[in-house]
Amino acid sequence: MLAKRIIPCLDVRDGQVVKGVQFRNHEIIGDIVPLAKRYADEGADELVFYDITASSDGRVVDKSWVSRVAEVIDIPFCVAGGIRSIDDAAKILSFGADKISVNSPALSDPTLITRLADRFGVQCIVVGIDTWFDDATGKYHVNQYTGDENRTRVTQWETLDWVQEVQQRGAGEIVLNMMNQDGVRNGYDLTQLKKVRDVCRVPLIASGGAGTMEHFLEAFRDADVDGALAASVFHKQIINIGELKAYLAGQGVEIRIC
């Protein structure tokens, strides 16, 4: 059995790490490189960086900080933000990133996933999915351009359909960003995670809602996700990564202990 992964998420805007609630009202957390080094030193298995306004601004991620992160950490990291072409991805990977993630650009052009997978291999192609539960319809819908609350829009895709579509096109991993739960720290949406797990054959990463160590345990034990991504509980030092891993190991979760 592969070890489960603990993955801090760093949302980047204007060269700094920020964090919002339900993808809105972002506050500045701190500088990118020191935070990345701190999480690596604490025992994170990998890091994910989202340049949250790159897609909505029509630009690619700022590469200047990617190489600086690669110099100070020795764990894998994934970068997302406005990647629309093989050339965009190649540049980010050449600066030291281990994986690239596509979200809004893939919704605009689903063939991008296949082209990236064919060029770089599925192992480094992650698809992020920003999913919102609609109380009125009882359905999960995929949103686009979520880094800018003024440009966010609901797509025609229902989440489960898009999960299956991106796998067919070559996604090697899926990060499910559950927008309703984002930043509120009341637990991952286990109902949605289980539904996605049933149709997801590639590694699945849960994102949105972690507030306690028990929430991580529930995601691993009840929804069988491969990794759990979180931001605010790590940024605000509510949970220490080393202590979290010790807790999970004590609960029988296969986890890498530093």
Curated annotation (Swiss-Prot):
The active site is at D11, D130. The gene is hisF. The keyword Ubl conjugation does not apply. Pathway: Amino-acid biosynthesis; L-histidine biosynthesis; L-histidine from 5-phospho-alpha-D-ribose 1-diphosphate: step 5/9. Belongs to the HisA/HisF family. This is Imidazole glycerol phosphate synthase subunit HisF. The lineage of its organism: Bacteria, Pseudomonadati, Pseudomonadota, Gammaproteobacteria, Enterobacterales. One of its GO terms (biological process) is L-histidine biosynthetic process. Keywords: Amino-acid biosynthesis, Cytoplasm, Histidine biosynthesis, Lyase. Pfam families: His_biosynth. Signal peptide: none annotated. Heterodimer of HisH and HisF. It catalyses: 5-[(5-phospho-1-deoxy-D-ribulos-1-ylimino)methylamino]-1-(5-phospho-beta-D-ribosyl)imidazole-4-carboxamide + L-glutamine = D-erythro-1-(imidazol-4-yl)glycerol 3-phosphate + 5-amino-1-(5-phospho-beta-D-ribosyl)imidazole-4-carboxamide + L-glutamate + H(+). Its EC number is 4.3.2.10.
